[in-house]
């Protein structure tokens, strides 16, 4: 019988000073990771405290403690008692669902088309438009929000719900545009030349050749974009006050909620992050794999 060759890890191949440096870096990243996770764990613990006794318990036991009795009913109360502008918590979840769905669909579609055109086609004014697009992303939102608010009011898009979202998601520029631009720029144009020789059109090149190759990376970016839309409270707060999402609704509730209602509010926060954790948990592995682009075989 052949002996099984013992595999050596990367750590065992390092010198002693390298192992020390590696251990220090690992410890620092571990501390950083714990510092990010701990607030959510603490919030989950406080969400199980009795609403009326939270302040008293914190004064007696300190800020960090585990309740003697766990009140899981706080999560039911989050659905039944919390509301904003006449919309209950379930309604806010539904608003967030279509907010993410519509915003993600229109954003990814138009950004992919715009990025592909700027990456693969040369036309007059291309550099000027590209520069203006980059400049618009540099300008702080506080500097453009006033003009944007007035424009939406003049176009009767203010507080129009899905209509506002469909129109504003068709801009074609943004952080996603820059990433897609790099993806399409790295796909060989030889694919398109082969299609043109066979009589294919520009639409055929994009929808049948380029987009399928970029789709894995686009899907990975869609996850991050979707999470950003789910957590986006500013847009709904400023331009869609009648249709509060989970993010904007919980933000407004936090401004006037009493101390007795804090555990129920924390329960609502925990519920709001569950969809994000589920999606990211299932997609995190494929996100890293799908950020590579295939190439031509020689």
Predicted regions and their residues:
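N-terminal Lys/Arg-rich, disordered targeting/topogenic segments
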Residues: 1-9
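A structural signal for multi-pass alpha-helical bundles of membrane permease subunits
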Residues: 7, 13-298
């Amino acid at each position: 019988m052949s002996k099984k060759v013992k595999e050596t890890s990367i750590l065992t191949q390092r010198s002693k000073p390298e192992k020390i440096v590696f251990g220090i870096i690992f410890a620092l990243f571990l501390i950083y990771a714990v510092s990010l996770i701990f607030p959510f764990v603490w919030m989950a613990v406080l969400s199980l405290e009795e609403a009326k006794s939270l302040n008293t318990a914190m004064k007696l036991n300190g800020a960090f403690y585990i309740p003697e009795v766990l009140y899981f009913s706080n999560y039911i109360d989050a659905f039944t008692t919390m509301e904003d502008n006449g919309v209950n918590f379930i309604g806010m979840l539904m608003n967030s669902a279509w907010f993410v769905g519509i915003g993600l669909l229109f954003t990814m579609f138009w950004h992919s088309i715009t990025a592909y055109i700027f990456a693969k086609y040369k036309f007059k004014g291309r550099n000027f438009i590209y520069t203006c697009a980059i400049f618009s992303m540099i300008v702080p939102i506080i500097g453009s929000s006033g003009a944007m608010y007035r424009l939406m009011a003049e176009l009767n898009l203010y507080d129009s719900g899905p209509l506002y979202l469909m129109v504003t998601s068709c801009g074609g520029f943004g952080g996603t545009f820059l990433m897609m631009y790099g993806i399409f720029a790295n796909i060989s144009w030889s694919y398109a030349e082969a299609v043109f020789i066979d009589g294919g059109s520009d639409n055929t090149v994009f929808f049948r050749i380029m987009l399928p190759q970029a789709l894995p990376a686009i899907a990975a970016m869609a996850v991050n974009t979707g999470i950003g839309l789910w957590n986006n409270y500013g847009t709904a707060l400023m331009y869609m006050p009648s249709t509060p999402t989970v993010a904007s609704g919980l933000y407004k509730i936090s401004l006037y909620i009493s101390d007795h209602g804090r555990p129920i509010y924390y329960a609502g926060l925990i519920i709001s992050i569950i969809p994000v954790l589920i999606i990211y948990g299932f997609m995190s592995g494929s996100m890293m794999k799908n950020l590579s682009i295939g190439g031509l075989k020689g």
